[in-house]
């Protein structure tokens, strides 16, 4: 019986000694992580804390303190390493690391780090998309800005830049929809300007192609986003080509109202006068011929017509 007690005591002593050895080993691993962290070797520190955590959890109650400390360091280090990836423009790996950080931080009860990592993801996606746009890789830029908007649907800047990328890629209709989204999310001034420019360029191209009816239609869409002298000029020229002189007069007059000092104002006035003269409206014809008498090319003829109409 005495021999049995001695054997049991030896076993218990051995277990206690092994436990002490395990705790010492885990503590040493944790301390190695702390030393690496002080030396700003984040990857080595992270690995040490992970190993220390795994060992501490096997120790149960004895390892709780070290495990708790490891859990406080690991998400913060993951986040810091992810931010370094962002600085190195390693955007895809950065996003993956940030997502891993969020999961770990939530698991370990670090809500602040989880929130910070989540807030950073749209910014990283934006940087990636911006880099693609600057490189004129419009397909990648479009994908990038769509990813930003998936994470942050109310991001007006992302919608605005998505519109720019789509417009540069030649997808005008989709660009307009993106600009409308931007306008609804704080970027109205710039978005409206971009939409107006798209319609204006379309109108000019249609006028050049002699597609006069659609040129008028596109030009008038410009003015839905703010009156534009050039749009009225295109609408007027297209209407004149369609022999819709009343419309041409109306649009030319709006052009002169918005751009009274334009370089071609006297020439436009001469055209309006001639159109009124064709309609038999002498008073209006004289009014606009008088605005054209200073024109170097048409001034003499304008004066001649005034004299004839009086």
Residue map of PLM features:
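Short coil turns that delineate tetratricopeptide repeat
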Residues: 57, 106, 153, 186-187, ...
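TPR-repeat structural position
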Residues: 42-43, 91, 138, 172, ...
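Canonical tetratricopeptide repeat
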Residues: 66, 73, 80, 117-120, ...
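TPR alpha-solenoid repeat register
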Residues: 62, 110-111, 117, 158, ...
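Canonical positions in the second alpha-helix
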Residues: 52, 101, 147-148, 181-182, ...
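Register position in tetratricopeptide repeats
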Residues: 38, 76, 80, 87, ...
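N-terminal leader/linker segments that initiate helical-solenoid repeat arrays
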Residues: 2, 6, 13, 17-83, ...
């Amino acid at each position: 019986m005495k021999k049995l007690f001695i054997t049991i005591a030896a076993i218990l002593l051995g277990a206690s000694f092994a436990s002490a050895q395990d705790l010492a080993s885990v503590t040493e691993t944790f301390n190695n992580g702390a030393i690496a962290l002080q030396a700003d070797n984040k990857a080595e520190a992270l690995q040490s804390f992970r190993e220390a955590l795994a060992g501490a959890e096997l120790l149960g109650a004895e390892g709780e303190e070290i495990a708790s400390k490891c859990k406080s360091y690991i998400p913060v280090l993951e986040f810091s390493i992810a931010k370094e990836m962002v600085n190195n423009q390693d955007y895809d790996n950065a996003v993956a690391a940030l997502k891993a950080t969020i999961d770990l931080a939530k698991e370990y009860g670090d809500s602040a780090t989880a929130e910070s990592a989540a807030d950073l993801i749209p910014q990283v996606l934006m940087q990636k998309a911006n880099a693609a746009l600057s490189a004129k890789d419009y397909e990648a830029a479009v994908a990038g800005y769509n990813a930003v908007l998936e994470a942050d649907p109310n991001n007006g800047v992302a919608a605005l830049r998505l519109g720019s990328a789509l417009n540069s890629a030649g997808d005008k209709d989709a660009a307009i929809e993106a600009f409308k989204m931007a306008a609804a999310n704080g970027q109205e001034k710039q978005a409206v300007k971009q939409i107006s420019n798209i319609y204006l360029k379309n109108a000019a191209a249609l006028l050049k192609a002699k597609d006069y009816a659609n040129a008028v239609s596109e030009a008038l869409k410009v003015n839905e986003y703010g009156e534009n002298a050039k749009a009225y000029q295109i609408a007027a020229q297209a209407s004149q080509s369609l022999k819709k002189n009343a419309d041409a007069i109306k649009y030319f007059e709006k052009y002169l109202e918005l751009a009274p000092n334009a370089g071609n104002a006297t020439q436009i006035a001469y055209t309006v006068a001639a159109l009124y003269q064709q309609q038999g409206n002498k008073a209006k014809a004289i009014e606009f011929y008088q605005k054209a008498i200073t024109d170097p090319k048409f001034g003499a003829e304008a004066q001649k017509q005034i004299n004839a109409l009086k």
